[in-house]
A protein has these predicted regions:
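Cytoplasmic membrane-interface "Motif A"-like loop-to-helix N-cap segments
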Residues: 77-87, 282-297
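Conserved MFS/SLC helix-loop-helix module at the cytosolic interface between two early adjacent transmembrane helices
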Residues: 66-105
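Helix-breaking motifs and short loop linkers at transmembrane-helix boundaries and internal kinks
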Residues: 47, 79, 100-106, 134, ...
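Extracytoplasmic gate region of multi-pass secondary transporters
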Residues: 35-36, 220-275, 366-371
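Juxtamembrane intracellular "pre-TM" segments in multi-pass secondary transporters
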Residues: 2-10, 194-226, 424-442
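Helix-loop-helix hairpin linking two adjacent transmembrane segments in secondary transporters
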Residues: 144-195
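Helix-to-loop junctions at the C-terminal end of transmembrane segments
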Residues: 67-79, 273-287
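Cytoplasmic helix-loop-helix junction between adjacent transmembrane helices
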Residues: 110-149
Length: 470
């Protein structure tokens, strides 16, 4: 067999393996978000209050967030294939249990299994991407993985919501369980090759692992990444996973079809915003926090419009809301870039796990507190008014305030660390003025007007190398 044939065969095998992995991730997102369109039927089936229903998603996210750092360790020790198989099986068992559960406690335990299985998938698929593809392709494949995962949310918002309205609870969630079984079978058959049972983790004592976690958290750049992930995606996560659907169908009196359509906007926005955000981050790495704060500001502004609107907001305001809060998804990926920038490779996995916890902690706090607020305004018949939903969603401003304050605080600390290392970040107005000078220089040419200014480092600021930071 020629070298070209070998490369073609390897490439084909890599794509088959990746397809099996991405299907498992799509199923994981489907499992994660399916309960968001089932909040009202769940309240009827389990005779549950709003805070009880919120606890389903809160428990799942709590398990997911709590497992992120341990999952990173297990990937190094056992390899991604075993963990993806385990994760898909756990999700299938959890959904099957939920399908037949008739009481609150068994249903909550089922969600624990689903959350545990979900927690094993994404990081494993990313690890496999690094093993299967060349270094040149890994960044693009990582971005593709995140975007394709949104198909799982589409499955929840449209076909599963329709199925839940036409079939029974047991039948609907049995279908979700069947997807988990299919993902497990495909993983066993095709998700192969490259597993490395890591000896490094076996050589680490528990105290060493604890010190590694502490070292990663101690750097303000890691904390900046944590609070970035805390403040950007929680609003769209809360809306799409739990309270958005009942808010639209019960509070705003939208039809189920219109509410499902609104939830799909997140997918379209992510597909568009992700490459744009990646371009901005790579071009202006020292202004990443400005992008993060802009994402938070856009989300808060959109919610201000919806909550301040007299009576029920028209559909166009909810569509605009979905566009602006969905930008927070790609914006949250900036947090992982902070982790990569400010941590050595020896603890990058730990730092990434810490950052990934932030968004889910913010989301589960918001979901649970919103459930408590809705219970306060409950009308005695399990129904919630538009005003009750508005008061509940207003809690998000508390989360944005905390997140923005901590971002600014840790950004200042990170800049002091950079200053001690000899890197001085100029004020934003200076960077904008320098960018304007570059633009004018390109338009007028080198012979028109005065020569472009020279940066304090002695380098011409018209050079292509990006010089913005944080």
């Amino acid at each position: 067999m020629t070298d070209a044939a070998v490369r073609q065969k390897t490439s084909r095998a890599a794509w088959i393996c990746y397809t099996a992995g991405i299907f498992a991730y799509i199923v994981a997102v489907f499992n994660r978000t399916s309960f968001g369109v089932a909040a009202v039927p769940a309240a009827e089936r389990f005779s549950a209050s709003a805070s009880d229903i919120a606890s389903f998603t809160v428990v799942q996210l709590l398990v997911y967030a709590g497992m992120q750092i341990p999952v990173g360790v297990m990937i190094d020790r056992y390899g991604p294939r075993r963990l993806v198989i385990t994760g898909t099986v756990l999700m299938a068992l959890g959904q099957a249990w939920l399908a037949f559960a008739t009481a609150l406690t068994p249903a909550l335990l089922a969600r624990v299994l689903i959350g545990a299985g979900d927690a094993l998938i994404f990081a494993c698929v990313l690890r496999k991407v690094a093993e299967l593809f060349s270094a040149r392709l890994v960044p693009q494949m990582t971005q593709l993985t995140g975007m394709l995962g949104q198909v799982g949310q589409l499955m929840s918002a449209i076909p599963f919501a329709a199925l839940l309205g036409a079939a029974t609870w047991t039948q609907s969630f049995s279908v979700v369980a069947a997807f988990g079984v299919l993902a497990a079978v495909l993983t066993i058959a095709f998700f192969r090759g490259g597993d490395n049972a890591a000896g490094q983790v076996q050589q680490l004592r528990p105290g060493d692992i604890g010190r590694q976690i502490a070292s990663a958290w101690r750097h303000p750049g890691t904390r900046l990444g944590f609070w970035t992930h805390f403040v950007t995606p929680f609003s769209v996560t809360t809306f799409s996973m739990l309270w958005g659907y009942p808010f639209m169908t019960e509070g705003l009196q939208f039809s189920q079809q219109l509410a499902s359509f609104m939830l799909t906007i997140n997918v379209a926005v992510t597909l568009i915003a992700a490459p744009v955000m990646g371009r901005l981050v790579s071009r202006h790495p020292l202004r990443r926090s400005v992008l993060v704060l802009t994402c938070a500001g856009l989300a808060a502004g959109a919610w201000t419009l919806v909550l301040a609107w007299p009576g029920a907001s028209p559909p166009w305001t909810i569509a605009l809301l979905m566009v602006l809060i969905s930008i927070g998804g790609p914006g949250s990926m900036v947090g992982f870039d902070f982790a990569r920038t400010y941590n050595p490779s020896s603890r990058l996995g730990t730092a990434t796990g810490i950052v990934n916890v932030g968004g889910f902690v913010a989301a589960l706090i918001t979901m649970f507190v919103m459930g408590l607020i809705l219970d306060v305004f409950e009308d005695g018949h399990g129904q919630y008014s538009l005003g009750a939903f508005k008061w509940a969603f207003a809690f998000q401003y508390v989360m944005w305030t905390v997140g923005v304050v901590m971002i600014v605080r840790n950004r200042n600390r990170t800049r002091r660390v950079l200053g001690a290392e000899g890197t001085v970040v100029p004020p934003l107005r200076s960077a904008l003025r320098r960018d304007w000078d570059r633009y004018r220089a390109r338009r007028t040419g080198p012979d028109a007007g005065s020569p472009p200014p020279v940066a304090s480092s002695g380098r011409n600021p018209n050079d292509d190398e990006p010089d913005w930071q944080i």
